[in-house]
């Protein structure tokens, strides 16, 4: 298991990017028993996409359940990774998926991330992604929400080195009485960083959507470029 073979790396990074003051992140951490750990060593390029699939199954009459998936990604210096995380559910019984993803990108690492939400229409999905991006790292995320009763996607990005490029894109489709809620925070903590954001959606019937985007520029983060 990763917890035994990579214990030092996990202990050094797990929780280091996440905001443990956030209620659902703290909830996930308190109930953490299992998850996925991805480490890309220095100068390694992973040619094929790494795919993570989380499925919740239920039958009529089942008791509602909660799951708390946790993902930790450590991308070493000059490494490259493409990651696809997908969430799906079956059955008519409601459930809660409360997931936390942490990505630590070291200098010049390139990470291309995709999240696809296809939860059951009776499910609630709360997903939090926390990023700490080192010097000249390039990170892009594409969040695609296709199903789920109530879906909230939170992204917190710390641009923690000079010359970082961070791109956050989102697409959502909702009908009926569903709610899709996207919240992003990008913190330009160092100079010469760039950030890009684009979220688009299609709504039908009585569906609702929320987008709340925050960009923080530190006083010393000179020559920051922000594209929204």
Regions found by a protein language model. Name each.
Residues 2-226:
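Conserved beta-strand/loop scaffold segments within soluble protein domains that form the structured core
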């Amino acid at each position: 298991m990763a917890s035994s073979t990579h214990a030092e790396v996990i202990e050094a990074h797990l929780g280091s990017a996440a905001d443990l003051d956030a209620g659902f992140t703290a909830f996930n951490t308190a109930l953490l028993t299992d998850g996925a750990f991805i480490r890309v060593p220095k100068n390694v390029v992973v040619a094929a996409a790494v795919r993570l699939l989380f499925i919740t199954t239920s039958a009529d009459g089942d008791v509602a359940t909660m799951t708390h998936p946790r993902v930790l990604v450590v991308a070493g210096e000059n490494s490259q990774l493409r990651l696809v995380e997908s969430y799906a559910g079956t059955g008519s019984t409601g459930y809660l998926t409360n997931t936390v993803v942490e990505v630590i990108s070291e200098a010049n690492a390139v990470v291309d991330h995709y999240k696809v939400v296809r939860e059951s229409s009776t499910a609630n999905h709360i997903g939090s992604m926390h990023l700490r991006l080192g010097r000249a790292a390039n990170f892009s995320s594409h969040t695609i929400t296709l199903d789920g009763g109530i879906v909230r996607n939170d992204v917190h990005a710390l641009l923690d080195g000079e010359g970082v490029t961070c791109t956050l894109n989102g697409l959502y489709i909702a009908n009926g009485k569903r709610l899709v809620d996207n919240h992003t925070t990008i913190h330009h903590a160092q100079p010469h960083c760039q950030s890009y954001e684009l979220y688009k959606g299609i709504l039908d019937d009585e569906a609702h959507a929320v987008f709340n985007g925050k960009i923080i520029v530190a006083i010393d983060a000179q020559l920051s470029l922000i594209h929204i």
